[in-house]
């Protein structure tokens, strides 16, 4: 009888120590998702960042043991279809579709072999003065390092549009911005668009519902927190990274602190 009791005690010890710790570790993962915009060597512009600063940030992440993972892997974890992530996992995204992504970001991405998700809005592609072209987007896609996802059709301010349109007009506008832009990207790029970044970080319950109806499985804001399972699928936060933040601020962001200009 004594050997059986000892065996049973060992099994209980394994059950109440190892397993709960594993589950707790998986549940408590916080994922910093970084949001970049335009890369400009001469800086002017509130959302700009020099390529040199970007490279220094990537190098710091690499030197300090961070693993830059594809956004889709983070999404799988947040949705519960992936049980765990590498230690110190972090995600790189870039919004809008600036040509500087091709000119300045691409060489650094290749150098460090890191995955990036681009959130672009079709209205500007091949039309905007400093925007990417469809051919450039395809080149980025073909590197295997860039995943292209949605950022609505015109990058409009939903709060302003809601105030200036009738309820029916606004509903039609939202459908074009979400479902319409999704189809355009899918037709041009031949890939499934399932992720969305909210322009100006603006979202509400109605927009979240419409995004889900349009076929998006997760959407991202710029609410300056680490993403985790406590957030709704259509409002996962990101940290916006700009030149006005010092390296000390960047490090604090990665640690989960709110970003502040220093």
Question: What are these model-derived regions, one by one?
Answer:
Residues 29, 34-41, 88-90, 98-99, ...:
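Metal-dependent polysaccharide deacetylase catalytic core of the NodB/CE4 family, i.e.
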Residues 23-90, 245, 253-262:
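N-terminal pre-catalytic segment of deacetylase/amide-hydrolase enzymes
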Residues 225-253:
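A cross-kingdom marker for long, charged
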Residues 46, 69-73, 121, 192-198, ...:
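Surface-exposed patches in mature extracellular/periplasmic domains of secreted proteins
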Residues 1-9:
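Bacterial N-terminal signal peptides that target proteins for export
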């Amino acid at each position: 009888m004594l050997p059986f009791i000892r065996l049973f005690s060992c099994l209980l010890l394994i059950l109440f120590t190892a397993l709960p710790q594993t589950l707790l570790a998986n549940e408590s993962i916080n994922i910093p998702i970084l949001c970049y915009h335009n890369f400009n060597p001469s800086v002017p512009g509130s959302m700009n960042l020099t390529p040199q600063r970007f490279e220094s940030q990537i190098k710091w992440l690499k030197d300090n043991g961070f693993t830059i993972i594809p956004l889709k892997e983070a999404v799988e974890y947040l949705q519960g279809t992936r049980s765990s992530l590498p230690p110190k996992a972090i995600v790189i995204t870039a919004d809008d579709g600036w040509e500087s992504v091709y000119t300045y970001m691409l060489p650094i991405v290749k150098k460090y072999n890191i995955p990036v998700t681009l959130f672009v809005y079709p209205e500007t592609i091949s039309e905007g003065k400093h925007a990417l072209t469809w051919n450039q987007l395809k080149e980025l896609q073909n590197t295997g390092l860039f995943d292209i996802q949605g950022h609505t059709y015109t990058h409009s301010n939903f709060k302003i549009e809601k105030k200036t349109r009738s309820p029916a007009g606004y509903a039609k506008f939202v459908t074009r911005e979400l479902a319409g832009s999704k189809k355009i990207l899918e037709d041009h790029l031949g890939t499934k668009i399932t992720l969305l970044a909210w322009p100006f970080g603006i979202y509400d319950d109605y927009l979240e519902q419409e995004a889900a109806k349009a076929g998006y499985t997760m959407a991202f804001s710029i609410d300056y927190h680490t993403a985790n399972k406590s957030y709704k699928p259509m409002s996962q936060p990101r940290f916006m990274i700009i030149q006005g933040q010092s390296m000390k601020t960047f490090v604090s962001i990665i640690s989960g602190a709110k970003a502040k200009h220093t």
